[in-house]
């Protein structure tokens, strides 16, 4: 038995639950990060957006918090809804892409101009 077959045999019992573990961890992470920004509007984010000259910072900050909770919920609930769940999961994933692109651009833009990007977990967070 070669190593590939051996690893396949070890992983086989977990094939059914692996996507659920990923859904639960990623979805819960976004729900908690969004919930941590309540009550709306999140004052720290509003101040950061104001300092960057963003129009309507209180509205945008509130939309980010609600979007994080909604996206995390969609990622988790998408696994429960059968065929419709694929659409729900993709919509939640699309919201995550928009939110995280904005987060990297607005809050973590220094990550892209430093060697620290490749020497810590930041590159993996960006890849997510």
List where the protein language model places each region:
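Membrane-interface interhelical connector segments
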Residues: 39-56
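Extended, low-polarity transmembrane helix blocks
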Residues: 1-39, 58-73, 77-128
């Amino acid at each position: 038995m070669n190593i590939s077959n051996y690893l396949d045999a070890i992983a086989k019992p977990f094939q059914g639950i692996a996507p659920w573990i990923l859904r639960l961890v990623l979805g819960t992470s976004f729900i908690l990060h969004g919930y941590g920004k309540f009550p709306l509007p999140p004052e720290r984010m509003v101040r950061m957006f104001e300092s960057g000259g963003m129009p309507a910072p209180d509205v945008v900050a509130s939309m980010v918090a609600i979007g994080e909770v909604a996206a995390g919920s969609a990622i988790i609930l998408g696994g429960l809804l059968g065929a419709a769940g694929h659409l729900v999961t993709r919509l939640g994933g699309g919201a995550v892409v928009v939110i995280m692109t904005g987060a990297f651009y607005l809050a973590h833009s220094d990550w892209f101009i430093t060697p620290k990007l490749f020497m810590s977990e930041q590159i993996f967070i960006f890849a997510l």
